[in-house]
Each structure stands twice: as structure tokens, then as C-alpha cells.
């Protein structure tokens, strides 16, 4: 897996395509400023950019580790503590949005807000803090936006690309060619949900790691054959989780660049 991003590029993956439609659907003037906010299960991201002749010039970006998914209880209700963390973050984001009109702003929620039984209650509070409406997007739409964001961030290649995004509550896998996603899937598993299910106290053992691997294999099995049949020439990772893994395997000398199967095997061994 390659992670072809500069220092903050992974933060753009779900934001650039949120900005792109504004130049067409919302009739923004070429030099206007637009903003997008992604309320992820693990972290919240905001990007502010100037749209100029279809090109995006990033002016500001903010990222906070809110860990909204950790606040889901056994009944899939968000705790008051997790809601307050999110609202505090959005209050800070809101300060940056004061001079951006609603027509030039898109705010989306993802997996945790799709799952939470009290999502509507939280969204009402969040919209009051921001002064703007929030759209909870579907898994396939999230996957589509991730793919388009990646394609705006990497060099074009001939053939098909597999994009993998491991979020806090969901994982998206998209095969596409150039800017056309050909097949996309959003699976209900992520770094936070797997951690809660298998490593809730932070301890890693062979049995717990095996349990996590089985969960992931079971979720991937229904789509495996179809994805292998479609094929791809390169795999690109598009999340903070993947970037963190790459940083570890490169630092330890297990890979010169990117993430290889052998590097992952050595990382697994080092964790035990």
C-alpha cells in the first residue's frame, strides 16, 4: 500500500470532493472561499479553501481527535461526554466559519452518526453550535467522496487503483480508474470499533489479535472474490491509521516506502 501524501494530505481525502461540487452545484464565483467539515468517527476535520477556476487553494485546515465512536454504548447511544467533546470541537470550528455563507459550506457526518440511535438529538445541538445544517451521508457516498479526494491528491496512473480508507467506525474500499469509481464498498468496521471489541483495555495478546483478524476476515469475505476479479494496479491508503502504520514500518526498517505484507507480518510479531 502506498500513501502518496504530503504532511497533511490525508486530511484532504474526504474534503476536496466536498468542495468540488460547490463550484458546479452551488454556483460559487471562481475566486470565492468555501469550506467543508467531516465529522468522522475518530476525528473531525475542517478545510477552508479558495476555489479559483476549478482549482482548490487550501487556506486553512483543522483536525481534532474527538473519538466520537468511543461514546457509543451497548444500545448505540452517544454518551453525553462524547457529545460534549464533539460540540466543543465544533464551537472552535464555527469561529472559522463566521464569514462563510451556507451556500459555500458542506458539513457531513459518517458512520457513527449513521449508527447512533440519538443521532438526531446530537445533530440538533451540533447545528445550533455551528449555525449550519449537517448532512449524514451514506456509506457508499462516503466511499465515493474518499475516492475522488484521493484522485485529487495523487499522480495519475494507467489502469485501476484500489483505495483503502480505515476510519474510526467504517472501512471503505474503492476500485476505480482515473476519476471514475467503478466499485465501492463501505464496511462497518474501523480502528475504534475493532479496538473496543478486541483491545478495550489496551492489552494485545495472540488470542485477542486472532479475534480481531477473524472479525476483519469475516467482513471482507463477501466482497473478496468480486474485488479480486476486478483487479487493480496499485493500492493507495487514505487514512490516518494507514499513515501511522507506514510511519512505523519505515522507521523500523521493515519497508523502504509504503506498506508491504512482510512489513505487516513483522509489525504483528513486534506487537506480541
Locate each region found by the language model.
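Conserved Rossmann-like nucleotide-cofactor binding loop
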Residues: 42-44, 169
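A generic, well-ordered mixed alpha/beta core segment in the N-terminal half of proteins
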Residues: 162-170, 174
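Conserved ATP-binding subdomain of kinase catalytic cores across diverse folds
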Residues: 58-67
Amino acid at each position: 500500500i502506498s500513501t502518496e501524501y504530503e504532511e497533511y494530505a490525508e486530511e484532504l481525502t474526504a474534503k476536496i470532493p466536498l468542495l468540488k461540487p460547490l463550484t458546479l452545484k452551488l454556483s460559487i464565483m471562481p475566486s470565492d472561499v468555501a469550506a467543508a467539515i467531516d465529522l468522522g468517527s475518530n476525528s473531525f476535520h475542517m478545510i477552508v479553501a479558495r476555489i479559483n477556476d476549478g482549482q482548490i487553494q487550501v487556506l486553512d485546515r483543522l483536525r481534532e481527535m474527538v473519538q466520537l465512536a468511543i461514546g457509543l454504548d451497548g444500545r448505540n447511544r452517544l454518551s453525553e461526554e462524547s457529545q460534549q467533546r464533539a460540540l466543543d470541537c465544533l464551537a472552535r470550528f464555527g469561529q472559522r466559519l463566521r464569514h462563510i455563507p451556507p451556500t459555500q459550506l458542506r458539513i457531513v457526518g459518517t458512520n457513527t452518526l449513521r449508527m447512533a440511535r440519538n443521532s438526531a438529538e446530537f445533530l440538533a445541538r451540533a447545528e445550533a453550535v455551528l449555525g449550519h445544517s449537517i448532512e449524514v451521508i451514506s456509506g457508499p457516498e462516503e466511499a465515493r467522496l474518499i475516492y475522488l479526494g484521493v484522485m485529487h491528491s495523487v499522480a495519475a496512473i494507467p489502469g485501476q487503483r484500489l483505495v483503502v480508507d480505515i476510519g474510526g467506525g467504517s472501512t471503505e474500499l474503492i476500485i476505480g480508474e482515473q476519476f471514475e469509481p467503478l466499485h465501492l464498498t463501505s464496511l462497518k468496521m474501523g480502528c475504534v470499533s475493532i479496538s473496543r471489541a478486541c483491545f478495550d483495555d489496551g492489552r494485545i495478546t495472540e488470542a485477542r489479535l486472532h479475534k480481531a483478524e477473524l472479525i476483519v476476515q469475516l467482513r471482507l469475505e463477501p466482497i473478496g472474490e468480486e474485488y479480486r476479479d476486478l483487479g487493480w494496479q496499485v493500492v493507495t491508503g487514505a487514512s490516518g491509521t494507514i499513515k501511522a502504520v507506514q510511519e512505523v514500518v519505515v522507521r523500523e526498517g521493515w519497508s523502504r516506502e509504503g506498506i508491504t505484507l512482510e512489513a505487516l507480518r513483522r509489525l504483528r510479531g513486534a506487537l506480541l
